[in-house]
C-alpha cells in the first residue's frame, strides 16, 4: 500500500510517500520539502500570512517532485496534518490533501502533527513499548507519555513560556546572528566553552515542577550578560555565549526527559521536532540514556524538521492497525491536543 502525507503546519511544505507492507513495515519512497524560511528571516520569525502564501505556491511543485521520487502516479491513501499549527497554513495543506484524495478516488486521513513527530522517531525502531517522547521545536517543548504510535498521548509537561526553539531564535537575534537560530548557535557552540558562563537552568529546584520547562529566564540572563559586557566595553566571545546557552538548554531538556522516563517506568525515549537535530542535544541525550539504561530513538536529521514523511508514516501505521478513513468534512484545529487520537 502506498500512503502519501502532506505537512503544512508552519513554514515547511512537505509531501512524503511511504510504502506499507503486509507486516506493517514501512519504506520511505519520497521526501519532498520546500521551506519559506528565508522569506521570514528579516522578520526574525514566522509570519503566518507569508507562510500560507508560500504553501499555496509550493504545494503543486512539491507534490509533483514527491510523486516523481516515489515513481507512482497516485497513492492508495492521502493523509494531512490538521493541527496543531498556524490556521492558514493548516488550511492550505488539508484542503490540498482532500482535493487530491477526491480526484484520485482514495481515502483521506486527518493526522495530528505532534503524533507525526513521534511516529517518525520510531520509524526505524522495533515495536514501540511504553515510552516517553520529548518533542522540541520552535513552537513546542513537551514531554509526552506514549503507549503506542497513533493513540492519544498524555502530556507530562511542557514549557510555561518560550519553546526551546523559540529561545534559540531570540538569543540568536540578540547576538545578531540571524534566523533561524538553532543551526547557527549549534555551529558556533562547537567552537566555544560550554562552561564559560554559568547561565541559569529554569525549573530545576526540588520544589519546581518535575516535568515542565521554562526558558524565559535563561533568555533574559543572556541578554543581561551581553548588555553588561557592552556597557563595560568588554569584547564577548560569541562562541562561548552560544556554547553556554546551548549547554543550559540541553542540560534541562535531557535531565527532565530521563526523569520522566524513570517516573513513568518507560524504557524508551523518543526525540522529535526540529531541535532534535541539535548535535549537543543528541549527544547529551545519548549519554544520559546510556547511564539510565534507557533506549534512545532519534530520527535521521532530515526527518527532525517538519516533513510529509512523518504524516504518511503515522497514517500508514494506523491504517495497518485498522483505522477508518476520515470524513472529508473534518476541519483543522490550530490548538489540537496530543491527548486525542492521532489519526481521526
Swiss-Prot record:
Pfam families recorded: TsaD
UniProt biased composition (Polar residues): 326-344
Gene name as annotated: tsaD
Transferase is among the record's keywords: yes
Cellular location(s): Cytoplasm
Function: Required for the formation of a threonylcarbamoyl group on adenosine at position 37 (t(6)A37) in tRNAs that read codons beginning with adenine. Is involved in the transfer of the threonylcarbamoyl moiety of threonylcarbamoyl-AMP (TC-AMP) to the N6 group of A37, together with TsaE and TsaB. TsaD likely plays a direct catalytic role in this reaction.
Lineage: Bacteria, Bacillati, Actinomycetota, Actinomycetes, Mycobacteriales
GO molecular-function term, one example from the UniProt record: iron ion binding
Protein's UniProt name: tRNA N6-adenosine threonylcarbamoyltransferase
InterPro entries membership: ATPase_NBD, Gcp-like_dom, KAE1/TsaD, Peptidase_M22_CS, TsaD
Top-level lineage group: Bacteria
Cellular component terms (Gene Ontology): cytoplasm
UniProt binding sites for substrate: 135-139, 169, 182, 186, 278
A biological process from GO: tRNA threonylcarbamoyladenosine modification
Region Disordered, residue ranges: 325-344
Catalytic activity: L-threonylcarbamoyladenylate + adenosine(37) in tRNA = N(6)-L-threonylcarbamoyladenosine(37) in tRNA + AMP + H(+)
